[in-house]
């Protein structure tokens, strides 16, 4: 009887130690994870997902138009649409497709429009620096064409001279979108 009790006790201890070891391994593996930013540093975090069965096709010339209409949750945050454009570039880069090998454009309108303001104007209106300044600069340096809807500027009471010089003013987002689609760009709405 004593031998049977000792055997059960040993099995319980082994089971407990196995559980503790498994929990420790899970914690260690989660601590070692780090997002990557191969092209747009600090924005558009990606994981390479080496086991992914579906990856970008290197034989395709990717031409994508992002339609950015959603504003950030708060004015001190980077616009999620701009971050998605950065993520697209970073995902392509971890798949060995560099910015020079893709053609990207983004049109900004609706609630997202304040991101286009020059820092001084943004600061005057919202009492903080424009958190989108750096990502706009990085996207332009990576070759992304950025547009803002002129109709939205007028509706929001924003003057053309208030727009960041890296962002072109379009007569309307409703002209940018079909023009790029007719030029063969894939349309990717960001709501």
What kind of region is each of these model predictions?
Residues 1-15:
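N-terminal secretory signal peptides that target proteins for export/translocation
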Residues 57-75, 116-120:
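Acidic/histidine-rich, surface-exposed loop or edge segments in extracytoplasmic proteins
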Residues 30-34:
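Sec/Tat signal peptide C-region and signal peptidase I cleavage site
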Residues 36-46, 122-123, 128-191:
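A cross-taxonomic marker for long C-terminal extensions/tails that follow the last structured domain
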């Amino acid at each position: 009887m004593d031998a049977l009790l000792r055997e059960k006790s040993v099995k319980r201890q082994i089971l407990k130690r196995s559980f503790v070891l498994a929990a420790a391994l899970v914690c260690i593996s989660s601590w070692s994870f780090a997002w990557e930013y191969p092209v747009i540093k600090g924005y558009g975090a990606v994981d390479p997902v080496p086991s992914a069965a579906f990856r970008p096709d290197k034989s395709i010339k990717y031409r994508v138009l992002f339609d950015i209409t959603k504003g950030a949750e708060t004015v001190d945050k980077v616009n999620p649409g701009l971050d998605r454009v950065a993520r697209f570039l970073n995902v392509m880069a971890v798949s060995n497709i560099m910015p020079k090998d893709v053609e990207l454009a983004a049109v900004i309108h609706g609630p997202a429009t304040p991101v286009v303001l020059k820092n001084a104007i943004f600061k005057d209106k919202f009492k903080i620096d424009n958190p989108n300044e750096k990502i706009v600069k990085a996207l332009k340096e990576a070759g992304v064409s950025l547009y803002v809807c002129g109709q939205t500027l007028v509706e929001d009471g924003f003057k053309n001279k208030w727009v960041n010089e890296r962002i072109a003013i379009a007569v309307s987002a409703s002209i940018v979108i079909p023009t790029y689609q007719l030029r063969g760009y894939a349309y990717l709405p960001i709501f």
